[in-house]
Amino acid sequence: MNSHSEALFEINQRLSSHIRTMSNFPVFDPQKITNDVEANIKRMTSILKSKRLTREDEDLMKMINDCSKVLHEMLLERIMLQQDSIQFFTEKEASDSPFSNSADTIDEDDDKKIKSRRLTKKQLLVLEGWFQKHKNHPYSQKDQTNLLIKSTKLSKSQVQNWISNRRRKEKNTKVSPELAALLLTG
């Protein structure tokens, strides 16, 4: 392995490590990942300027590109989930406030008038927030179920069915073949 190949292999390993970290741990240090990726970009830029790439180097560059795409998508998804959670808790705090606007209750009444089989975004945020908080043991106790019923305005059976379906969805989540290949190479 030439020096470029060794450096590219190391970059690929580091990106794969970040992907595994994000896949396995709900909490990670985004600043650490950002700093590492920026350092890797600088290293790759200098390697590309040398213009002495072997076939092995080109293959490693393709793998790094694939890892970068996966890492990018995972980061975007995490950011979206985080923003949804922040928005949910901000809205919840505002609605719990004694100074909350009466327009909020009008919106909720409008939600009831629409005969839709799907849950509203607010209901999904509440339920998903509860599920993420209780992911280690996603079985609601009676008081938690009652709290979810009050905050979502759903029936007991709807709440219980949603939690049951969400547990099943979590259990059946499969890793895509592309991601599995990347995780196995690391």
From Swiss-Prot:
<dbReference type="GO" id="GO:0031138">
    <property type="term" value="P:negative regulation of conjugation with cellular fusion"/>
</dbReference>
<keyword id="KW-0539">Nucleus</keyword>
<dbReference type="GO" id="GO:0000122">
    <property type="term" value="P:negative regulation of transcription by RNA polymerase II"/>
</dbReference>
<dbReference type="InterPro" id="IPR001356">
    <property type="entry name" value="HD"/>
</dbReference>
<dbReference type="GO" id="GO:0036166">
    <property type="term" value="P:phenotypic switching"/>
</dbReference>
<dbReference type="GO" id="GO:1900240">
    <property type="term" value="P:negative regulation of phenotypic switching"/>
</dbReference>
<feature type="DNA-binding region" description="Homeobox; TALE-type">
    <location>
        <begin position="112"/>
        <end position="174"/>
    </location>
</feature>
<comment type="similarity">
    <text>Belongs to the TALE/M-ATYP homeobox family.</text>
</comment>
<keyword id="KW-0804">Transcription</keyword>
<comment type="function">
    <text>Mating type proteins are sequence specific DNA-binding proteins that act as master switches in yeast differentiation by controlling gene expression in a cell type-specific fashion. Transcriptional corepressor that acts in conjunction with A1 to repress transcription both of homozygote-specific genes and of genes necessary for the white-opaque switch, a prerequisite for mating.</text>
</comment>
<dbReference type="Pfam" id="PF05920">
    <property type="entry name" value="Homeobox_KN"/>
</dbReference>
<dbReference type="GO" id="GO:0005634">
    <property type="term" value="C:nucleus"/>
</dbReference>
<dbReference type="GO" id="GO:0003677">
    <property type="term" value="F:DNA binding"/>
</dbReference>
<keyword id="KW-0371">Homeobox</keyword>
<keyword id="KW-0805">Transcription regulation</keyword>
<dbReference type="GO" id="GO:0030154">
    <property type="term" value="P:cell differentiation"/>
</dbReference>
<dbReference type="InterPro" id="IPR008422">
    <property type="entry name" value="KN_HD"/>
</dbReference>
<dbReference type="GO" id="GO:0003700">
    <property type="term" value="F:DNA-binding transcription factor activity"/>
</dbReference>
<dbReference type="InterPro" id="IPR009057">
    <property type="entry name" value="Homeodomain-like_sf"/>
</dbReference>
<protein>
    <recommendedName>
        <fullName>Mating-type-like protein ALPHA2</fullName>
    </recommendedName>
</protein>
<comment type="subunit">
    <text>Forms a heterodimer with A1.</text>
</comment>
<keyword id="KW-0238">DNA-binding</keyword>
<keyword id="KW-0678">Repressor</keyword>
